[in-house]
């Protein structure tokens, strides 16, 4: 027993010494990195962060250290970019050097470097190019992408009509619609909202979305080499990701039986055709594991982000009934109450378009982009960032910039309207990030938000259960995403 105790103590001391040595070695090179608060061994700058509101902590540090500074999450340095000028300079002007994907261990450990979002190098380029082309040429089958979204908008309205103007929580049903659009893209089919298979898929996606924003997952990302061997929520998280991948692979088996390369029906068909096309290439990136992870990425990125934006949008329109009234007036005047909205209507709906943009700006759904990494030793301003260093561009610092938006903390569609009431574009609108690592589904997300939003407002008036002034619209802030507070509403048919 004494020998066991001594061995355990020696192991703990060794790990501690190695960690201290690692920090010390990194600190020796800090002269090349931007300035920042001095890190402590093992925990880095954790004490400078409010884990319940990391974006606010990062903005506060920018006031002290400037728009480019270094922060240690655990033992690893991260360069934080705060403000439009430095974010643009890094992601656009020096985009090729900042092209890497920084680590997010809770995801990396399950994706193993495959897929669209957390891959790097040539694999990432191949998967992104294929996915962009597939989505862009989505005349697969007999329906365009817009027609698929319009169909889902109609189904969403039918489902919402069943609430009969009674109070309900919109969280689940607003997630069903974008999830079904991804189902349509991936395997050319949609589900009824009460389908058991669909409900199980929604449950997997929702639980992991909630969990990736938890403090536990943030702890895992700081010390993955230790926590991965402990019991905890990360095990359930990984199991659910595997379940989503297995669900996709079952659909792949069905597609393999009826594949016609000359007439691809969906994303899976296109991917299977590429697998066949490159079957003699031993280094091909087109294989079933990559297909499963790409499909999982599309579900994760394409379901909860869109539904959360819609949910936040409805809450804001109840908070500001005068804005809702103006949207109703414009929709009635331009489209009427019976013609389904289409993308060609967008140019004729400047106020509605401004409201949609302001919702996305105001909520800053993703306060920072997913982490980047420099792919080589990179000269940036007065600093040299070593190859592989994580870089965190703060999108909220761009969309809440007082130089561009007169009242950035206030919800005001006027931020996107000129003096004539026409829609006004701005380079400071970056909810999908910037550069080559910008969201691959940006065009789809924009289409979904416009068609779902206009269809809902065309058919319903939004009624709050309390006085508008008493509605809480303060986001539930975490390290990764901003969520609206829970609420119920009544949808009154128009």
UniProtKB/Swiss-Prot annotation:
It is found in: Endoplasmic reticulum membrane; Microsome membrane. Its main location: endoplasmic reticulum. Pathway: Lipid metabolism; arachidonate metabolism. One of its GO terms (cellular component) is endoplasmic reticulum membrane. Induction: Constitutively expressed. Up-regulated by fenofibrate. The keyword Iron applies. Belongs to the cytochrome P450 family. This is Cytochrome P450 2C23. It comes from Rattus norvegicus (Rat). The lineage of its organism: Eukaryota, Metazoa, Chordata, Craniata, Vertebrata. The gene is Cyp2c23.
């Amino acid at each position: 027993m004494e020998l066991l105790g001594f061995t355990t103590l020696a192991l703990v001391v060794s790990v501690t010494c190695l960690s201290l040595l690692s920090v010390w070695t990194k600190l020796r090179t800090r002269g090349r990195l931007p300035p920042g608060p001095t890190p402590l061994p093992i925990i880095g700058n954790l004490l400078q962060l409010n884990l319940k509101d990391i974006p606010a902590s990062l903005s506060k540090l920018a006031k002290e250290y400037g728009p480019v500074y270094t922060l240690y999450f655990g033992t690893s340095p991260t360069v934080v970019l705060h403000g439009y000028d430095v974010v643009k300079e890094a992601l656009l002007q020096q985009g090729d050097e900042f092209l890497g994907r920084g680590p997010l261990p809770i995801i990396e450990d399950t994706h193993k470097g495959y897929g669209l979002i957390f891959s790097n190098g040539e694999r990432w380029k191949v998967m992104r190019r294929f996915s962009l082309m597939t989505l862009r040429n989505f005349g697969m089958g007999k329906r365009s992408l817009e027609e698929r979204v319009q169909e889902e908008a109609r189904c969403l309205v039918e489902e919402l009509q069943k609430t009969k103007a009674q109070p309900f929580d919109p969280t689940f049903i607003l997630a069903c619609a974008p999830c079904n659009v991804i189902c349509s893209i991936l395997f050319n089919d949609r589900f009824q909202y009460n389908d058991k298979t669909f409900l199980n898929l929604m449950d997997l996606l929702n639980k992991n979305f909630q969990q990736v924003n938890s403090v536990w997952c943030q702890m895992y990302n700081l010390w993955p080499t230790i926590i991965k061997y402990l019991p905890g929520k990360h095990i359930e998280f990984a199991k659910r990701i595997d379940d989503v991948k297995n669900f996709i692979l079952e659909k792949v088996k069905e597609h393999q039986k009826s594949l016609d390369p000359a007439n691809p029906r969906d994303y899976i068909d296109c991917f299977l055709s590429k697998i066949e096309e490159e079957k003699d290439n031993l280094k091909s990136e087109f294989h079933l594991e990559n297909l499963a992870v790409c499909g999982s990425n599309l579900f994760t990125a394409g379901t909860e982000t869109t539904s959360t934006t819609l949910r936040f949008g409805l809450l804001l329109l109840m908070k500001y009934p005068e804005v809702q009234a103006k949207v109703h007036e414009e929709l009635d005047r331009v489209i009427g109450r019976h013609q389904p909205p289409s993308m060609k209507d967008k140019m004729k709906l400047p106020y509605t378009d401004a409201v949609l943009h302001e919702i996305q700006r105001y909520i800053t759904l993703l306060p920072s982009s997913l982490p980047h990494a420099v792919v080589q030793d990179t000269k940036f301003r007065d600093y040299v960032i070593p190859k592989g260093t994580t870089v965190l561009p703060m999108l909220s610092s761009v969309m809440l910039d007082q130089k561009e938006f007169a009242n950035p903390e206030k919800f005001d569609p006027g931020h996107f309207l000129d003096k004539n009431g026409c829609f006004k574009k701005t380079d400071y609108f970056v909810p999908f990030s910037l550069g080559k690592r910008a969201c691959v589904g940006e065009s789809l997300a924009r289409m979904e938000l416009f068609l779902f939003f206009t269809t809902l407002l065309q058919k319903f008036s939004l009624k709050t259960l309390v006085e508008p002034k008493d509605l809480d619209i303060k986001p539930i802030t975490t390290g990764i995403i901003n969520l609206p507070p829970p609420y119920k509403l009544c949808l009154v048919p128009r």
